[in-house]
Each structure stands twice: as C-alpha cells, then as structure tokens.
C-alpha cells in the first residue's frame, strides 16, 4: 500500500508513475474523497468540542439551580449528530482504504518503461545452451519414459487438469532438488529454514498484497461456521514468511532477517486458460523454495542484488544456462518496485522460461502489515523494506534438468551437485 501522505501531497506525480505500469489512477475520485474526508473530520471534531463544552455547562447550571433540561436535550442532539458524522467518516475511510489497497506499487526510476514482457531488458546471460546430435524430447516424454515418473493421466483422474503424480526416481529427483536448494541457502547464503502453514487467513493475504486484487486467483476453504473466517491455500510461501513480521517492531541489530522455506504453492491460474497446458510449466499445485528478506529502508536495493545472486547460484551449480531479465514497468508484479527474472534454457521449447522472480517491495507490504524496526539514531519506528524471490521453482527446475541433461536413449544424467541427494545415482534411465 502506498503512503497516504504521499498520495495526498503528490497525487499527480503518483498518477504519472502508475501510468507507466499501465494503471490509471482516478485523480479526481481520490481528490474528491480526500476533500470529503477532511471536511468530515473537521465536522466531527467541531461536534466533539461543542458537545464537551455543553456537557461541562450542565454541571455549572445544575450547581446554580438553573433548569438543565434544555442543555441535556442539546447535548443529546449533538451526540446524535456526532455519532452520525463518525459513522459517515468510518464508511468514507473504508472507501478510501479499498481504493488505496488496489493501487499497485510505484516503479523505481531504474525500471525500464514498457507495456509487457516483450519490453523487458536482458541484463546478462550465463552458460551456453547445449547442442544435441539427436532429436530433443520434452520433459513430459522424458519423465514418462523413466518408469512413468511423470504421470499426468492419473493426476487428472484423482483431481483434474494441471496436476501431476510423480513416482520413483523422478519423485526422488524432485525431492533432491528442493533439499539441495534449502541446504545451499541455509549453509552458504545465511537464510534460516522455516516450516510454515499452507493455509493462511485473510489478513495474511492482505498483508503481502494478494488480497483484495487477486482474491479470484486463490483457492479458498469454506469457514467452519457462519461467523468463522475462511482460509486460503498459499500461492507462495512469501505470504506466511513475510507476515511473520506483521504487527512487529524489530531492533535494527536484528536485521536483516533472511528466511527460506520449501512449500507447495496453489494457484487457480484464472488468467492463463489455454497457456502451457502440457506438462509441469503451469500447474495448480507446484513446489517452490522461497527466499524472503526483511531489511532496513536504505538496504533494500543492495539486498535485491544479493537475493537475485542467491537464486543465480542455484542455476550455476546445476550448470543450467539462463539469462537475467530486468522487468519493465508493465510486466512487474502488483507489489514490486523493481524485479529481476531469471529465465532458464529449455531445449524442447528452444527458448528461455522464467524460473525465478526476485523483487524489492520497498515498504509497500510493510505498510499493510505494520512491520517496523526501530531506528537506532532517532529511536523512532520505521517501516521495514521487504524482498522475496524464488530460489527456485522446483518443478520448473526439474523440467530444466530433464531437458538439458537428456541422453539419446532417453536416460537423464544427474547433475553432480544433486548426486549425493540421490544416494550416488548418476543416471536415471528409461525402462526398455
């Protein structure tokens, strides 16, 4: 959520920046609501003051023997007017909050202006795509060939489309990938491993910016009672990890806080009908190792470079070719002010596909969550800056390994860094 004071004082500048990312801020509507808010707040304060004055005069009138009935009637009428004004103000503040909760973050000045992914800027490349002397298979055929290790047909029977059943060596490889990532981030990159709930409440989804804008993209449980609140399956462990800081005040010497977790993620993919219908690329349920950092306000861009580098290290150790992209204004996520995507090479598609997205949210999420730290110089509380990134998406990493490490006979060579997690197995092969 953007700073309300900033919007009041620099609404036109905010509108110009938001326009760059394809969001049109209704300046007239916001200005009108703010004018009405100020008027109502003044009216409420005036009524409160007048009521206090009249209430005090009742005691004096009573002490002097005057008839206090007229004063009591006046105080009662003022009380009714005050309650009505407060109710109207509360409704107006809710309307303003609903508006501001749906406004995306402002793009940083270093972000290139553009409409969509076609205008993202390539920053760098690592590795050289392998040249094959045989016909390349995609991960669906390769996975099926390893003892039916990727079984989409059974998953469709169990649940529906965009799910998978993994078995045998493919399931073990999938687990090995996640374990390797967690070990790397905790042992070399300084993150604390966390185990978090896969179901979260509305406040958590609101805190990280999934709600209210993307409420239709989540899977929800029904409340246990009419009064109870339904829960949502996490679309990413960014939600529970970041919300750990909600309503907290940290000492500066506790920062940065770096957390990582391996969880399933659940997304309805409401806006992707017909896209990536084959295979693991776009699933309703998928595993991801997430990285989250909570830092001081002046450290977040430095932290973004570090966090992105942590994700890159995974790809480098797996020896998977990738490119680093700086997202343009029109392709960034709702809460991000700057984002780097890492795209891994997929031979069967003959292109790079996103495998990690690393974003600096500035204080956008922290303001929603009231996640703060105490500045040691001023002793005042300041909003944290939050960052998150995939380190990596496990399923897409499995896809990349299957396709990049495939052999002519359909077998898969296991990347060297994963072999200890596979009990020394170096090759998994197709059943003949």
Curated annotation (Swiss-Prot):
Return the GO cellular component terms, semicolon-separated.
cytoplasm
Q: Which SUPFAM superfamilies match?
A: Class II aaRS and biotin synthetases, tRNA-binding arm
Q: What class of enzyme is it?
A: ligase
Reactions catalysed, as given in the entry: tRNA(Ser) + L-serine + ATP = L-seryl-tRNA(Ser) + AMP + diphosphate + H(+); tRNA(Sec) + L-serine + ATP = L-seryl-tRNA(Sec) + AMP + diphosphate + H(+)
- Give UniProt keywords alphabetically: Aminoacyl-tRNA synthetase, ATP-binding, Cytoplasm, Ligase, Nucleotide-binding, Protein biosynthesis
Q: What is its main location?
A: cytoplasm
Question: Which pathway or pathways does this protein act in?
Answer: Aminoacyl-tRNA biosynthesis; selenocysteinyl-tRNA(Sec) biosynthesis; L-seryl-tRNA(Sec) from L-serine and tRNA(Sec): step 1/1
Would I find Lipid metabolism among this entry's keywords? no
Residues bound to L-serine are 236-238, 290, 390
Q: State its Enzyme Commission number(s).
A: 6.1.1.11
Where in or outside the cell it occurs: the entry states: Cytoplasm
Any single GO BP term: seryl-tRNA aminoacylation
User: What does the record say about domains?
Assistant: Consists of two distinct domains, a catalytic core and a N-terminal extension that is involved in tRNA binding.
Q: Describe the task this protein carries out.
A: Catalyzes the attachment of serine to tRNA(Ser). Is also able to aminoacylate tRNA(Sec) with serine, to form the misacylated tRNA L-seryl-tRNA(Sec), which will be further converted into selenocysteinyl-tRNA(Sec).
Q: What is this protein called?
A: Serine--tRNA ligase
- Native organism is Pseudoalteromonas atlantica (strain T6c / ATCC BAA-1087)
